[in-house]
Amino acid sequence: GVRVEVGPSGYDQPGAEALWRRAGEVGAVICAHLQRDYLGELAALLARFPQVPVVLDHCAYPRAADGLADEAVRQTVALARFEQLVAKLTFAVTSSEREYPFADTHAQLREILAAYGPERCIWGSDFPCEHWLKKSTYAQHLAVFAEELGLGVEEKAGVLGGTALRLFFGA
C-alpha cells in the first residue's frame, strides 16, 4: 500500500487526484493517514474512486474521552457506506488515556467493528510500538484484540490477519 499524509493544500487536491487515479490503474491500496478534519475530503475521493481500496489509518484518531460521541468515530462509522474502505484500528492504544488494557477505547472499537464488520477491519501494531507509545508493548497491543475485546474466533481471524492478507496479497 501507499501511505498518504495530508499536505498543506489539503487531502483532496490535484496531486491526490492523480495518485488515486494511478492507484486504481495498478491495483494499489491507499493508506489514508489523516485527522478528523479531512474525513470529508476523503469521502469525496472515495466517491470518485470506488475501485481503489483504502485503509483509514488510526480511524482519524478518535479521542477516547469523547466516547461514542467523538466526531472521528461518528464520521468513520458513516464512511462505512464506502465498500472499498477498511478501518485500521490502531487507535486502540494511540487514543487511549489509560494503561493496558486501554479500556477507554473499547466501546469505540466495538462501534467501528460493528459498522465495518471484521472483513473490513484490520489491526495495526504501531510497530515498533515501544518506540512510539511508551505505555504499551507489542504483546499488550495485540492482546487488546486477541483477548480484551472479547472477539469471536471469526472476528479475530479477520481483524488479526485475514482482512490484511486479502487486501494486500489477494489471499
For the regions a protein language model found, what residue spans apply to each?
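Divalent metal-coordination and catalytic microenvironments
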Residues: 2, 23, 58, 87, ...
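Catalytic pocket-lining loop regions of alpha/beta-barrel enzymes
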Residues: 9-122, 131
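Mid-to-C-terminal alpha-helical segments outside catalytic/metal-binding sites
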Residues: 110-111, 115-122, 131-171
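Residue-level "edge-of-site" marker
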Residues: 7, 36, 126, 159
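Glycine-rich phosphate-binding "P-loop"
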Residues: 1-11
